[in-house]
Curated annotation (Swiss-Prot):
Keywords: Cell inner membrane, Cell membrane, Heme biosynthesis, Membrane, Transferase, Transmembrane, Transmembrane helix. One of its GO terms (cellular component) is plasma membrane. Carbon 2 of the heme B porphyrin ring is defined according to the Fischer nomenclature. The keyword DNA-binding does not apply. CDD domains: PT_UbiA_Cox10 (cd13957). The chain crosses the membrane at residues 24-44, 46-66, 94-114, 118-138, 146-166, 172-192, 232-252, 278-298. InterPro entries: Protohaem_IX_farnesylTrfase, UbiA_prenyltransferase, UbiA_prenylTrfase_CS, UbiA_sf. It catalyses: heme b + (2E,6E)-farnesyl diphosphate + H2O = Fe(II)-heme o + diphosphate. Converts heme B (protoheme IX) to heme O by substitution of the vinyl group on carbon 2 of heme B porphyrin ring with a hydroxyethyl farnesyl side group. This is Protoheme IX farnesyltransferase. HAMAP family: CyoE_CtaB. Belongs to the UbiA prenyltransferase family. Protoheme IX farnesyltransferase subfamily. One of its GO terms (biological process) is heme O biosynthetic process.
Length: 299
């Protein structure tokens, strides 16, 4: 009996943990932390580091849980998402919504009183943008859903920055622009790989409505746009040579994968491009930090 009870409790905890989409939130929090560190020349304020990260993570997890609730019919059709807790009946809608609401309330309270009101309101706007505007409306309405809804997912570095400064800085907006340009090739590569599942679920992703060839061209075009956007921190003097070299190398590799998709020259290029896009964003933001803390001068 003791082992059975322990297993049941552990399974319940894991279900709620899965509702938070921890891997997605972890990548978002990396970009938020980079925003914080780039904004702080005189040392990191403890309230921004601890409370800021906690509040942003809680609201991001709330948005993820709401996404599980809203998308459960779509998730039930797609192989990638069929085992999610709500689809499997391990967590019902009421408990999931209560969980999401609780995370949002606690997260807002932490940000509003422990960090600053601007960060709280911007983070709430990001939650609404992703969980309501994108998930509830755009995802089902237009093949440009990822483009139009991408701003909400691009916000974390701005949220991290404002948690330190309490203001919206142009440099933070450059980081938002990079993620905004990164979002379409990232998701469209997955959509090409999962085209049949999206079609079966009735989601008008670009490959479903316009075909693979059209989508691959736009992946290439947006990757070029991303490459240009990634150069802006160096061009504007925000970052130095370490970042420039890293962004150049990472960007050329991303373009190589986008070109391979366009030319159909590599097996499984779509899913490999999707996976590389995650590595790309992680390493690009690590390069931002390395450049910030390692002084390099060329004479």
């Amino acid at each position: 009996m003791k082992n059975t009870a322990s297993t049941t409790a552990a399974a319940g905890w894991r279900d709620y943990y899965e509702l938070c989409k921890p891997r997605v939130v972890a990548l978002m929090m990396l970009t938020a932390v980079v925003g914080m560190l780039l904004a702080s020349d005189q040392g990191m304020p403890w309230n921004a580091l601890i409370l800021g990260n906690l509040g942003i993570a809680l609201l991001a997890s709330s948005a993820a849980a709401i996404n599980h609730i809203v998308d459960q019919k779509i998730d039930a059709v797609m192989a990638r998402t069929q085992k999610r807790p709500i689809v499997q009946g391990r967590v019902d809608n009421v408990h999931a919504l209560t969980f999401a609401f609780s995370l949002a309330v606690v997260g807002m309270a932490i940000l509003a009183w422990g960090v600053n009101p601007l960060t709280a309101w911007l983070t709430l706007a990001s939650l609404i943008g992703y969980a309501v505007v994108y998930t509830l409306f755009l995802k089902r309405a237009t093949p440009q859903n990822i483009v139009l809804g991408g701003l909400a997912g691009a916000a974390p570095p701005l949220l991290g920055w404002t948690s330190v400064t309490g203001t919206v800085d142009p440099h933070a907006l450059l980081l938002v622009l990079i993620i905004f340009a990164w979002t379409p090739p990232h998701f469209w590569a997955l959509a090409v790989h999962r085209k049949d599942e999206y079609a079966k679920a009735g989601v008008p992703m670009l490959p479903v409505t316009h075909g693979d060839r059209y989508t691959k061209l736009h992946i290439l075009l947006y990757t070029l746009m991303l490459f240009a956007a990634s150069m802006l921190p160096f061009i504007t003097g925000m970052c130095g040579w370490i970042y420039f070299v890293a962004a150049l190398a990472l960007g050329v590799r991303f373009l190589d994968w986008a070109w391979a998709m366009w030319r159909d020259s590599r097996k499984h290029a779509a899913i490999k491009t999707f996976r590389y896009s995650i590595t790309y964003l992680m390493l690009l933001f690590v390069a931002l930090l390395a450049d910030h803390y390692i002084p390099v001068t060329l004479s």
